[in-house]
Amino acid sequence: MTKAAQMAQTTAKGSVHLLWGLILSTVISAVGTIFIAKLLGDENYGLYTIAVNAPVLFATFRDWGINTAITRYVAQYNSQNQLEKIKSTILSGLIFELTLGIILTIISFTLSGFLANLFGRPLITPLIQISSIVILTGALISTATAAFTGLEKMHLNSIMLIVQAAVKTGLIIALVLLGFGTAGAVWGYITAALIAGLTGILLTYTMYKSLPKTPNSKLEILSTTKIMLKYGAPISVGAILYGFLGQFYSYLMNIYVTGQTGDAAIGNYSVALNFVVLITFFATPVLTMMLPAFSKLDAQKDQQTLKNVFQYSVKYASLIVVPVTAIVMTLAQPAIITIFQTDYSQAPLFLALLSISYLFTAFGSLSVSNLINGQGYTKFNIKVAILTAVIGFPLSFILISNYGVVGLIITSIVVSLPGLFISLIFIKKQFSVSVEWLSSAKILFSSAVASVLTYLLILLLALPAPLELAIGVVVFVFVFTIMSVLTRTLNKADITNVRDIVNALGPLRKPLNIIIDIVEKLVELVH
């Protein structure tokens, strides 16, 4: 087995461990979201959404790229068996995150009135004061996640996610039913985040203590922090620019999307965002696990492996994420109606538009930044962020002022493309690596055909929404599979690679191999 195939196995195993955590936590959260949205109504749900997101402006300054640095260096040191450096990296990152988390939480609490006025809703000042704690809890959760990812212990991350989802759902529903309204929802959200953060740190500690002790070694907190800041600061500068851009979007929304109609639109937007997790189920594990994978490789010594790993990541991620995205876009309306009936009537349109950016997986959007950061070229992030900001500020003003939430979504789609394209040019020049464009085109074409046929069939049948949803999923999967075989998107080499990857997935190996056998027979018929 090649080195690329071995890395693919490890990455797939970590992705599956993260996937089950995402699925369970999201199902729990989705059930909670349905009840919470119904209990609060679209206006109060919109206020709840604003309150818990308001401190993001200050949270942007907490990380300074430290969490990305933790993942990168822990993965690198683990592959080099430098265990003491792993300990120094995790502990240094935690100290840095906690220190800034506490400081920024206090600042956010103090300036909560300013934030409330900035969002055009001064009455939610107490809610923003409560939600300011999310900055500190975010430090705990993100540090634990970075450590789990670097050591590829994603089952621990899944435990943390499930704890957060279960506590959040139970607490918010209970507090709202007890009559605490929007304030109860915010308290439930923050309490769950705190419990999840403490759980994550406890699991990180057990993982930390399990690392073998190295004789005559000591922790080097200050020097390690300097190394991580040198690596992570450019990422943070980019993140801060993105943060200001996001807050500018929010500011425009508060000016042009106002009143009861505006709050309802924000509520619809929030519901649509919750449905997008159907796509992130599959996109997030790939996005998360590729940074440690690329961090283990040396572009000079492992050039061919680097190329293979990148192309595998793009192609196989696209084979999953692109069709799932197409399903969500095609069946957005019956999906929303099935759960909310006639409520949240704008959500299907918002959901379909929000899904578009995940189609860029076929262009390498989930892998390219991880390749660049994994190889240490973090300063490139600043160039991408500046380009995005230069386009985003004027474009958002034009689109949001005229089209509200739709303008916001279109802006977020458009501004991401230039950065993606210059990133692809960079990796081509720097590493001689590129996307396998023909495969990506075939995947997009197969998904488009399946979407069109599924949509037309549902339009003709005009059945109740739950039946349309069920039939639509079955028809789409069938058509996409046939089209993938006919267009030769999958070949025998791909089948072999996928089978090797699947064989590392334990209990999932047998059912997945049955599916692979069926696809293999279809491929043999065409070839």
Question: What does each model-identified segment do?
Answer:
Residues 112-131, 260-263, 328-360:
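Interfacial segments at transmembrane-helix termini and the short loops linking adjacent helices
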Residues 14-29, 164, 188-196, 200, ...:
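Transmembrane helical elements of multi-pass membrane transporters/channels
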Residues 10-72, 101, 105-109, 129, ...:
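Signature of the first transmembrane helix
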Residues 64-79, 150, 209-213, 272-321, ...:
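Helix-loop junctions and terminal segments of transmembrane helices
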